[in-house]
């Protein structure tokens, strides 16, 4: 019996066998990603797809400065409000900047017809040529061209728009006028004019020498006849009269004709337009700085190659797509679950089931071995590189497909188009929700696939080792194998590179397996003997105890015993 127990203890003491484990990289990263099934999964590596920062500045766009309207708005600039005179020299720009509270627009009160459409047209213009369409000195010889008003005062004196002429009577007469212009600029020409509506007949007769007047404007695409509406109105900027402002785009080679017998606010300067990709109009209080950018928002410039941003829906230039997301992070590495580096009964290192290895820094997947010569980590470079190439190509493909750089400007609606504006906002919100949903779903799905891909690669590496070793080693859990033979560093390297010589070690493994199996049988015999002795001893103790209790109870009369023959 003693000999058998000694054999068992010796066998248990001699099982410090060589081992090899398959596992994956872990590090101290705190990056988290979301997948379809999980949230906030900690991973070793990831890339951010969502830009959420800007510099708070207005910058040059591709080296070209914006047109800052300052205290003027589009109307004041394009009509030539005297307070916007400094803008008359501007010829080109990358984008146009209005401030939210610009005060200088139409100085003489009235309606700017189709103003929102004009803003939309100008948002795609990157430069223009301002030229005299009708000469102030020679085009209207029978009319006075110096009409001014206190509503458009400048430097304390009455003045008028720098791009329009207020034609009035001359020497007590206002003869019919008829003038035309042929567009020979080779590009679209923006022409502006106005129609004056006095507040009373007296002003009408004083200015135009007649009570009934008309204005006619005709081109190949435009044909309107205007009749002044004479009526008392509340004073605005000290004026009871009104001027309605009009515009049209004249195509190359087209002719525009003006005919009137009063009340015409005639064109003086017009604009030959040059359209450019990426221009636009933004409303911003940000200040201009010495900086360059490829993407400008009202909040500030964005310098990013990421496919998405959540800064502002209005963008100028080559900009990421706006989404409402707060996080779009795509995993490129593995689940980051560093294992507790503890030694077990056989000195095994926790493998890929329990967690990754922070000690393996030169690859994503690899091995940890232990033998008489020592222990160490080694990455499987081939599987790691294949995974890196595949994931890099996938990330680049996703970014390329989603990274459609473009300008997104707000649409213009006037006060009478609120229903249309509200409908447009709902449609835009719907598209924005779809874009946001698609972006988030894409990232969730790709993250799930990437993590599954890594799990599959680790499993494939495990199966590769298992298929080589076959019954020359046994699986001991945690991604580890215990050899039935001695495996030095050369042997370990052959397992890692796939050249393990199974027949070379099969005989030694067979003998060691038989020894271990024999020890198991011997130990089974020992356990059976111990079990029999234990059962017999327990039964004997129980019988003696029962006899003693019975004798005591009989002696004090608690139990009566009768023997019948």
From Swiss-Prot:
Residues in a coiled coil are: none
Name its GO BP terms in alphabetical order: clathrin-dependent endocytosis of virus by host cell; fusion of virus membrane with host endosome membrane; fusion of virus membrane with host plasma membrane; viral budding from plasma membrane; virion attachment to host cell
SUPFAM superfamilies from the UniProt entry: Influenza hemagglutinin (stalk), Viral protein domain
Domain of life, per lineage: Viruses
Q: List the subcellular locations.
A: Virion membrane; Host apical cell membrane
Q: Which regions face the Cytoplasmic side of the membrane?
A: 550-565
Task: List cellular component terms (GO).
Answer: host cell plasma membrane; membrane; viral envelope; virion membrane
- Residue ranges that the UniProt entry lists as topological domain Extracellular: 18-528
Question: What pairs make up the disulfide bonds?
Answer: 21-480, 59-291, 72-84, 107-152, 295-319, 487-491
Instruction: Tell me yes or no: is Disulfide bond among this UniProt entry's keywords.
Output: yes
PTM annotation: Palmitoylated.
In terms of InterPro entries, this protein maps to: Capsid_hemagglutn, Hemagglutn_HA1_a/b_dom_sf, Hemagglutn_influenz_A, Hemagglutn_influenz_A/B
Gene3D superfamilies given in the database record: 3.90.20.10, 3.90.209.20, Hemagglutinin Chain A, Domain 2
Q: What is its main location?
A: virion
Signal peptide span: 1-17
Q: Determine if Metal-binding is one of this entry's keywords.
A: no
Q: Which family does it belong to?
A: Belongs to the influenza viruses hemagglutinin family.
Other remarks in the entry: Major glycoprotein, comprises over 80% of the envelope proteins present in virus particle.
Its biological purpose is as follows:
Binds to sialic acid-containing receptors on the cell surface, bringing about the attachment of the virus particle to the cell. This attachment induces virion internalization either through clathrin-dependent endocytosis or through clathrin- and caveolin-independent pathway. Plays a major role in the determination of host range restriction and virulence. Class I viral fusion protein. Responsible for penetration of the virus into the cell cytoplasm by mediating the fusion of the membrane of the endocytosed virus particle with the endosomal membrane.
**What protein does this entry describe?**
Hemagglutinin
């Amino acid at each position: 019996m003693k000999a058998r127990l000694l054999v068992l203890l010796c066998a248990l003491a001699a099982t410090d066998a060589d081992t090899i484990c398959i596992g994956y990289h872990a590090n101290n990263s705190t990056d988290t990603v979301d997948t379809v099934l999980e949230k906030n999964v900690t991973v070793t590596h990831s890339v951010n797809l969502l830009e959420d920062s800007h510099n708070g500045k207005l910058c040059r766009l591709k080296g070209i400065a914006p047109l800052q309207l300052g205290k003027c708005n589009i109307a004041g600039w394009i009509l030539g409000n005297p307070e916007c005179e400094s803008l008359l020299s501007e010829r080109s720009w990358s984008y146009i900047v209005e401030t939210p509270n610009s005060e200088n627009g139409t100085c003489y009160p009235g309606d700017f017809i189709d103003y929102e459409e004009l803003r939309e047209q100008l948002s795609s213009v990157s430069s223009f040529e301002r030229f005299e369409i009708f000469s102030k000195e020679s085009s209207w010889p029978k009319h006075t061209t110096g009409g001014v008003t206190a509503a458009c005062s400048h430097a304390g004196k009455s003045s008028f728009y720098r791009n329009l002429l207020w034609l009035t009577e001359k020497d007590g007469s206002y003869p019919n006028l008829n003038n035309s212009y042929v567009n020979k600029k080779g590009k679209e020409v923006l022409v502006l004019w106005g129609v004056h509506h006095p507040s009373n007949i007296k002003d009408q007769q004083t200015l135009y020498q007649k009570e009934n007047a008309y204005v006619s404007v005709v081109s190949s695409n435009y044909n309107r006849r205007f009749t002044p509406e004479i009526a008392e109105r509340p004073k605005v900027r000290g004026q009871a009269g009104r001027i309605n402002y009009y515009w049209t785009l004249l195509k190359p080679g087209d002719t525009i004709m003006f005919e009137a017998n009063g009340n015409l606010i005639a064109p003086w300067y017009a604009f030959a337009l040059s359209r450019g990709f990426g221009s636009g109009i933004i409303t911003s209080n940000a200040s201009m700085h010495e900086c360059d950018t490829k993407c400008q928002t009202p909040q500030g410039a964005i310098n990013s190659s990421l496919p998405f941003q959540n800064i502002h829906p209005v963008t100028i230039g080559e900009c990421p797509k706006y989404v409402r997301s707060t996080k779009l992070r795509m995993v490129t590495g593995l689940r980051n679950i560093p294992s507790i580096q503890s030694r077990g009964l056989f000195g095994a290192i926790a493998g890929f089931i329990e967690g990754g290895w922070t000690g393996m820094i030169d690859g994503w997947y690899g091995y940890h071995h232990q033998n008489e010569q020592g222990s160490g980590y080694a990455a499987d470079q081939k599987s790691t590189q294949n995974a890196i190439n595949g994931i890099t190509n996938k990330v680049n493909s996703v970014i390329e497909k989603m990274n459609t750089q473009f300008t997104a400007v707000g649409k213009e609606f006037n006060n009478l188009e609120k229903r249309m504006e509200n409908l447009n906002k709902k449609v835009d919100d719907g598209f924005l929700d779809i874009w946001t949903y698609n972006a988030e779903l894409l990232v969730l799905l790709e993250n799930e696939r990437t993590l599954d891909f890594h799990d599959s690669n680790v499993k494939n590496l495990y199966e590769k080792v298992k298929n080589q070793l076959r019954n020359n080693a046994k699986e001991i859990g945690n991604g580890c194998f215990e050899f039935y033979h001695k495996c030095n560093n050369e042997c370990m390297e052959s397992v890692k590179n796939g050249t393990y010589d199974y027949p070379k070690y099969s005989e030694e493994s067979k003998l060691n397996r038989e020894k271990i199996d024999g020890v198991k049988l011997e130990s089974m015999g020992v356990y059976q003997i111990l079990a029999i002795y234990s059962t017999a001893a327990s039964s004997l103790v129980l019988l003696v105890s029962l006899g003693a209790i019975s004798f005591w109870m009989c002696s004090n009369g608690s139990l009566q015993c009768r023997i019948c023959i």
